């Protein structure tokens, strides 16, 4: 058996897909194996997320440098973990949590901690001669996810676009992941033509989706419907729609302000707004349809639409088991978005997925808007059989890298691979 004892840990400052600094961590084992991880970063971040440590030195990268986090890995964390077993993930992560000591991991930085946590797992997988999905998921890891493709961007991810942040397609009717990716890519190219034909801009946002200026929020749904039909696919059967309006960004003084429509809505009115959209479009998933602290609104939303639509908590739940446990008991939402850097360790991420599954909820593994060539989430979604991945449009290498990794995994699994399709959802359609 290869020796999985940690020999050395080193970190460095690298760039993410937005040109901002982030942290990369290498973990070296006595066996000679190495694991490397790059930590992602979000644009719209939940107030309850683990804290990403930034330098605040305005003379470097506008204050966004991560040299403190790098130093914390190279000194405090390296000194504590060298000599430990990288294959004992729970112990590694518990040590990292204790070493930081803060609830939000703000002392050493959740970015420093996550980089080490993931690099340890990758190093241990390499030492065992296993791909990461197999190392983490064991012999039962075989489900390829339905991609939730963000093909139209608005909100914080684009300027002069819609109030709502993300409009997505989900190719649920495809027979395999490879075909799902093809369908999504063809619809994406079709959307580009639709926007172009209407005289719109085909600039892309952070996650590869187009960001045209549109007169109303519903206009975004209308042009996606046209793009799906032009590409030759059946909406509501082969392809479903999903949205992430990121409603925390719209919530002020107890109301939801839809500037594109000149309206301010109460929580109850916002729930009815979504019910109306769901009645007229084949919407299967709605993420952050209400604000992160609007618990009463979330309960109302679940009661109104929870049997028909996947109601995903992102800013609302921040991959946090405490918030998730409360949401499960209060019947607020029925699905959780899983972002590694919201909680900061692999163990806590896996705990959140397990808790969701036990409650009959779904879990959607997600990227952040600031990404890199790191493909960990592709392996994670297969390892956990989560069945859904959210990693942007089929454009920009930082997004496509994850899709390409899933193609490789599907090929490697061969006849054992199972594409989740509509089985990824626990709602009646």
UniProtKB/Swiss-Prot annotation:
A GO molecular-function annotation: magnesium ion binding
Enzyme Commission designation: 4.2.1.11
Chain positions recorded as Mg(2+) binding sites: 244, 287, 314
GO biological process: glycolytic process
Top-rank lineage group of the source organism: Bacteria
Segment forming the signal sequence: none
Subcellular location: Cytoplasm; Secreted; Cell surface
Keyword tags: Cytoplasm, Glycolysis, Lyase, Magnesium, Metal-binding, Secreted
Residues at the active site: 207, 339
Cofactor, how bound (note): Binds a second Mg(2+) ion via substrate during catalysis.
Record's keyword annotation contains Magnesium: yes
Pathway: Carbohydrate degradation; glycolysis; pyruvate from D-glyceraldehyde 3-phosphate: step 4/5
Record PROSITE patterns: ENOLASE
Cofactor(s) in the UniProt record: Mg(2+)
SUPFAM superfamilies tied to this protein: Enolase C-terminal domain-like (SSF51604), Enolase N-terminal domain-like (SSF54826)
A single GO cellular-component term on record: extracellular region
Annotated binding of (2R)-2-phosphoglycerate, by residue: 165, 339, 368-369, 390
Family: Belongs to the enolase family.
HAMAP family documented for this protein: Enolase (MF_00318)
Name this protein carries in UniProt: Enolase
The species this protein was found in: Roseiflexus castenholzii (strain DSM 13941 / HLO8)
